[in-house]
């Protein structure tokens, strides 16, 4: 027993010295309930994807990779994340390495262009230095890098067209992520990298698909999301959008390999009400009787949403209070009411009661 007490005393002194030298929180006991905090997130902008992540969105203090084929919806998801971060009062930055950001489309998705930080870097080193500086500032909540494939090293840009530059981009990403990863965790920012798919030559077995930029991002990313474009969404004979399937291929904060399906309308982004309606029907929150759809409110009142899915979706668009109540019930069912969102809702409710 005396030896145990002595060990405990020595350990406490060591922990105290570490905290004095490196700051509070630099070391902690994992099982201490006062130290373990729920995962803070920035919503994805899609209820289905929020559910698939297992925590309700992109985890703060982490690196996220969104990858997929061309025109699969990667940038759309990134812009929706920016809009959500701004709604929460956060600061967002967009590193446009592709030099292809459409401000009109971003605005249609809900992005506040007046407060959005944007950079169009000349080369990969500049882009990643800007990311590092923004993360270290501690005041930026979300940084999107679009995309890894466009982060061309300076040596490649300055070299001749036919020069062999083996592994330059992979080394650049590896070096940069070593610096950024530690800073991200302390700043509580989310850094989203969008990435493209390439084909490995000569693969006989397994998938020939891989992502650009080497292996570093795969290791440092807390969450990796694979985006694939599905069947077209039609209005009559006209194609107005696409079904998008998302698979969480890596997740360090919740069980991985969950999938989600969402609906992107060209020029408008994710159709939230259509997505909400489908989830609510599948979860039994919205009832179907013949071709009619009904919802029973928390007060016990049965509300008719309309005949047919299109009318029901339009009803949800026209009645955001009911849509919001349905969404909260779904989030509560999956335990996804984040601390920040819940606090905002309580503040709005209390301010409304005070006003009345």
Curated annotation (Swiss-Prot):
Return the GO cellular component terms, semicolon-separated.
cytoplasm
> Quick check: keyword Lipid biosynthesis in the entry?
no
Describe the function of this protein.
Answer: Can catalyze the hydrolysis of ATP in the presence of single-stranded DNA, the ATP-dependent uptake of single-stranded DNA by duplex DNA, and the ATP-dependent hybridization of homologous single-stranded DNAs. It interacts with LexA causing its activation and leading to its autocatalytic cleavage.
Question: Which keywords has UniProt assigned to this entry?
Answer: ATP-binding, Cytoplasm, DNA damage, DNA recombination, DNA repair, DNA-binding, Nucleotide-binding, SOS response
Q: Where in the cell is it found?
A: Cytoplasm
Q: Extract the InterPro entries matched here.
A: AAA+_ATPase, DNA_recomb/repair_RecA, DNA_recomb/repair_RecA_CS, P-loop_NTPase, RecA-like_C, RecA-like_N, RecA_ATP-bd, RecA_C_sf
Which top-rank group of organisms is this from? Bacteria
Source species of the chain: Thermotoga maritima (strain ATCC 43589 / DSM 3109 / JCM 10099 / NBRC 100826 / MSB8)
Q: What is its main location?
A: cytoplasm
- The protein's name is Protein RecA
What Pfam family is a match for this entry?
RecA_C
Q: Its Gene Ontology molecular function terms?
A: ATP binding; ATP hydrolysis activity; ATP-dependent DNA damage sensor activity; damaged DNA binding; single-stranded DNA binding
Q: Which GO terms describe its biological process?
A: DNA recombination; DNA repair; SOS response
